[in-house]
């Protein structure tokens, strides 16, 4: 009789424990979804008109991402029909909308011999998706964007450069895991792993209790995103032998430099294929200084010189 009571007690304890874990998982999943349950639209003040860049043409494209909804992208090329030396796939940041806010960068790259494929990520501007979904969604979208862009007749056989700002830089580094054939990658104010900023935000909001929630957030990401959930830029650097240019500002309060640049430099600072650009006086937004005509050409010139070296 005593053994039977112990067995029943053990079963009840296991049931309560499992119920608690399921409840914690569902709560973490709901919190996670709520955090990314919004769309982003580029404001009028941040949007650039293609007509202001007469040296550049573009063609509109749509392609499906992993969930099946359609993303919108544009292939930018030279108005004089000059053959490009390489294809740059560019991923935008999070919060200000899609790719249309970066046209001066594309124009600079095009005038220096590159074609650029830039797209609106899930839940941004012209792309489908009720919400952005997650930070991981960024490099899922970039994976599919690269595959699509490489399949275009205009880009056939061109060396590939992955490039992005902030969330897009996270995506660019992580996309090396699925596209290690890239000749070069340029990350501007990015970081290593999507979960790092999610964990940081969770701890700031919940204090020590956040440490109890984080494992369930990780489980939700794995269940939802599969192989992409365990991706990191560091793994991408190990999979590829491409050139890597890492750009960051020490004053960045949005993506702290220790979440990306410092991690990469600890291993690769003396590696010949890595170029590190660290600014002591720049933060997140002003990492690419703006002039009256768009983005300052100082850093863009460094980026082009770096890419030229790696695309041959």
Each language-model region and where it sits:
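An N-terminal hydrophobic leader/cap segment in hydrolases
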Residues: 16-64, 74
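The serine-hydrolase catalytic nucleophile loop
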Residues: 94-107, 121
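Catalytic nucleophile-loop/oxyanion-hole region of alpha/beta-hydrolase
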Residues: 98, 122-156
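Conserved alpha/beta-hydrolase
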Residues: 108-128
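Hydrolase active-site cap/lid region
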Residues: 174-226
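Short beta-strand/loop motif that positions the catalytic acidic residue
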Residues: 240, 246-248, 252
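Short alpha-helix in the alpha/beta-hydrolase fold that links the catalytic acid
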Residues: 242, 256-266
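C-terminal catalytic histidine-bearing segment of alpha/beta-hydrolase fold enzymes
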Residues: 270-312
